[in-house]
Amino acid sequence: MRTISVILGGALAAAFTAAVLAQEPRLVSEDMMVPSDPGIEVFVRNKRPADMTTFRPERIVLFVHGSTYPAHTGFDLKLGGMSWMDYIASRGYDVYLLDIRGFGKSTRPKEMAEKPEANPPIVRGDAALKDIAAVADMIRKRRNIPRLALIGHSWGTALMATYATQHPDLVERVVLYAPVWVRETPSPIRAGAGPLGAYRTATVEQTRTRRFNGIPEDKKADIFPPGWFEAWADATWATDPVGAKMNPPVIRAPNGSMQDSIDYWSAGKPYFDPAKITAPVLLVHGEWDRDTPRYMSQALFPLLVNSPGKRYVELAEGTHAMYMEKNRLKLFEAVQAFLDESGRS
């Protein structure tokens, strides 16, 4: 199933995006479901300029989300009139995002219809990588290209990096935003001891508290422009109609990523070998990020020994969720500069 719409840039309330959207081309948006494993369909969204007729590897990007929230409510949520997906597409890119199975608009595994304690953690990295591979294959065939660029956020950085080690000839560039690496500190979203269930739940207020973790007290009041967090939360929690019926409403997230973290990152074992990545890599991190602390990026960067033109950018006054904060444009600009280099090389 595919849904196509046309998006027109408009006037913005936020000053920093007004000038950007004034120059935006008309964008086409297309939603589709891509088959993965038997019985699993992955939600994919594509945005591109309406007049785009030539598709080149250096101008095609695929984004994947982290361990709790889907891609389409973060990467393509209009805040101040513009989403990150819009920002990239309006610069002449063919941009895709996917919700991994169990998240957002993709198929929910049958275990999510049962109580979490009834099953072990679902949607581990190997399953998520099948979804990514299915979507990447579809894009390459659709556009008749040999490679594409990858953007991963949080857990998605481990997935995209792993994909790049497994398929080096299919990857143009890799952006790892809030990179995951071997832990020296406890995970902020791993609560309690004992075995994990199939999935976990989070309320809006629990998430709001986590979002402020690491921000200096005198900076908390204005980290989110008015209404931005609420807009994201409304869009995100609406993707889980089952969780919405609970009191208080929750979003359910598969625990496979948490089990992988226990078995690998928290056990001192890397999930992937950075030396096997042969594409250019950008690590980008917000200084107030406590979910994936700075030491992770600093440890990972020197291990990317075969990545030509690798770089690491630390952004001031940003957290793990900088894409929805007041300084989001700094994140967009840093990533865009890296993506644009491919077309000049």
Language-model features: locations:
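N-terminal cap/lid segment of alpha/beta-hydrolase-fold proteins
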Residues: 23-56
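Short, surface-exposed "cap/lid" segments of acyl-processing enzymes
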Residues: 51-97
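Glycine-rich "HGGG/HGxG" loop immediately N-terminal to the catalytic nucleophile
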Residues: 71-73, 98-120, 320
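Conserved acidic catalytic loop of the alpha/beta-hydrolase fold
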Residues: 127-147
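Conserved hydrolase catalytic core segment
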Residues: 146-151, 155-184
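Alpha/beta-hydrolase
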Residues: 185-284
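Conserved alpha/beta-hydrolase "acid-adjacent" motif
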Residues: 290-296
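Catalytic histidine-centered segment of alpha/beta-hydrolase-like enzymes
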Residues: 318-329
